[in-house]
Amino acid sequence: MCTKPSFVSQELFLATVQTLRPASAGDHTRLANSTAGNSGLWSRVSTWGLLLPLLYFALDGVSPFVNGPASMRAVSTGGSALMDRLSNVLILGGCMIFVIQRHHAVLWLSEQMKLVIFFPILALLICPVSQQVTRTISSDAVLFGGILLVFYIMSRYTVNEVLELFLVLGAATIVASILFALILPQYGRDLMGGHSSAWKGIFSAKNYLGNMALFFLTAAVSYRPRTSLFRSVRVSQILFCLIAIAFSRAATTYMLTTVYIAYATTLNAVRGFRKKDYFVAFILLFVIFASVVAVAVLQPDFLFSLLGKDATLTGRTEIWDAVAGSIAKRPLLGYGYQAFWLGYKGESYRIILTVTWALGQAQNGFLDVMLELGVGGLVIVLLLFGFAFRDAVTCLLRSHDDSQLRAVEWYFAIVILTLIYNLDESFLFEPRHLGSLMFVLACVGLKLERLRLQSFPANRAARPTLSTGHPA
């Protein structure tokens, strides 16, 4: 059972637990009538305002009219530019405008998600050893604001409303990306590194377009439209996301799109069967994963050719070897949050000289966490993944609520994709990366669904046909 946080009154705690109850058909009808009327999701000024910080995170804080090396854009100021500091303060302030509106609920979620909150706290605690203290503090503030914004979203909107938010945001950014690639190729195509035919759209790089298109695709697939208009938007968005993925030329995204399709198809096939069939589904997915690993070990050249990579994973293995040497120098505390990749300054210069490649990340999210926060940061991330998997499996095996199962399946998909993505890309706890915030959102959602399941055991036996997920 969930426990009451010390800083929240008993009334608030009971009210919060009440919001986790399974919704009845009557509740669903009332919600449908409400959303159809003036109190609907898009009649709220705050919902439209929320799209602004989400768009900022979706674009990684980079103007779509910039088409330079993504790695050097991230570190070009080395943390010294006044405008960079000012923009961080503004985005933190923008996030806090929303957070303050529901500060009690945000505090309650902070108590439930201690690991998520402790990551930026740890970054702040060890900032004295950072290679660039000002960059660490300002970036940490943005990360903290983004996390609190996620808590606000999860306390304010139902699961389907969250999906609708990402549907609208995704439709705007993906359609804009397609238009940029076709009409403004000097901005919409990745002209760096010999990828002139690859689309990047309004995003910072082709891999980022592929990453976000896939995440938006999962939201569109999981969303249940409430009107014919949103039904059309959903179908169009699925098509646009697949087009963006195809023309991003991002090999990792190709592979993960296949993984997601297999995941969604398998769970959809077993959803109407008995609970033990979920266990069978997990076994099938494990067999598929083990088969891929076996091919990678026994026939690596064949697998690499399918992914469009060579035996060094397009130079990634050389980067990882060089990064391991830097980690060995500071394994406990790292080099400071967002303070390792400083271009031709500090320890990152040694790696750039070694691999003869201008870098802004280790091409592996877990290695980047080690570089920045040492062992402590890595432990937090691994525990967060572990708890997310525990919560997901618990809900999938015990819940009989169709709406809850659909929510858990979407959250779990985001967690799985984030895990695999960060094996050869990097965005774990990035301060301005929407994928990072969606991962945090998924972890929060899985925790809330498990608490809901524990708080209302009847949900295990009952199987209501209508449910709304999280409270508005």
Which residues are covered by each model-predicted region?
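Aromatic-anchored transmembrane helix interface
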Residues: 111-121, 131-155, 165-168
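A conserved mid-to-late transmembrane alpha helix and its immediate loop/hinge
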Residues: 242-253, 354-392
